[in-house]
């Protein structure tokens, strides 16, 4: 692992520090931009050409990241200082091999291996971190799934052991939903579909992400710094809107920090962790963990001071650079600049060369802006951008972000224009 760093070189020279992004979506793009600001050389990898991060990288490679030989060919050629996974669809054996060969995998190969597999993650949360979670059981047959759902109780959630963004998951309201849940898990799983996890439904007040970052302090000691919890809601298992700070009690906020600290201490390494939790009153349950910047954390592009978004914090940690913070009641906290919110801009249709309109109206709204990711292809439900808004009142920011997002229309080469108003579930402005 790298140590506290006081020097940086210059990109494309023999003094350069170099990062290799495995995954080049919108989150990787922001990491790449922050790296460019510090003169760090950026190499981006993804399964398709001209992915967002590739557009701001020094070099890029296109290939199957589940192919270990392909990954090794890139790593041996580039010899990066840090290998930064941005997605889950990566050959895990390769990550362990890179580490064994002396490369720095962020935060470490084991954390990535645990986080992408729900059984490994749940057992780590409960048995190693010893944090509260919803009740859960596993099923490997349809009969076992019926039995597990009965024991957990209705409603409950079924999820493929390996999946993301809501794929392979089902909200089971009663026994009549179980065949559909079984089919969803079996057909939408990533990798093995042998086992399904059944989780108790928590009737939470708000779902939050704690963007805990493990990094070196100015004395060279690894510490964990906690930004304010980010509130968010999902539609069909995928992030749709987020805001910071989440509206939770002071007691719940301290519990969020406590749980995130226990989890990240167990996972180890350096970098930011998106720790997802449910909050109801003063009670908090751990849910999932992403050992990388989190999509809900894009709100920090507005809510944090310039140069300190979740992407900048991640990069600082990865490079061995310090992050400022203030100790309050035993936790090292990162100060927020202003309450802010995001709302997604999604495609309703599929096709190439997306175009956007409504920008004159959207970009005329005070204290708001739009980020378009530059993805060359749209498909139904794909996130192509976000609206960002900020205000001293987080509720105002939430409504403004939603309003601005819904001002944007988009089309592709093969489709007509469509707006964002086809989706109204959970929205504030109906």
Curated annotation (Swiss-Prot):
Pathway: Purine metabolism; IMP biosynthesis via de novo pathway; N(2)-formyl-N(1)-(5-phospho-D-ribosyl)glycinamide from N(1)-(5-phospho-D-ribosyl)glycinamide (formate route): step 1/1
Chain residues that bind Mg(2+): 276, 288
SUPFAM superfamilies named among the record's database cross-references: Glutathione synthetase ATP-binding domain-like (SSF56059), PreATP-grasp domain (SSF52440), Rudiment single hybrid motif (SSF51246)
Gene Ontology molecular function, alphabetical: ATP binding; magnesium ion binding; phosphoribosylglycinamide formyltransferase 2 activity; phosphoribosylglycinamide formyltransferase activity
Pfam families: ATP-grasp, PurT_C, RS_preATP-grasp-like
GO cellular component: cytosol
Annotated residues for binding of N(1)-(5-phospho-beta-D-ribosyl)glycinamide: 26-27, 86, 295, 375, 382-383
Domain ATP-grasp: 123-319
Binding site for ATP: 118, 159, 199-202, 207
Family: Belongs to the PurK/PurT family.
Assembly and interaction partners: Homodimer.
Protein name: Formate-dependent phosphoribosylglycinamide formyltransferase
Organism: Pyrococcus horikoshii (strain ATCC 700860 / DSM 12428 / JCM 9974 / NBRC 100139 / OT-3)
Underlying gene: purT
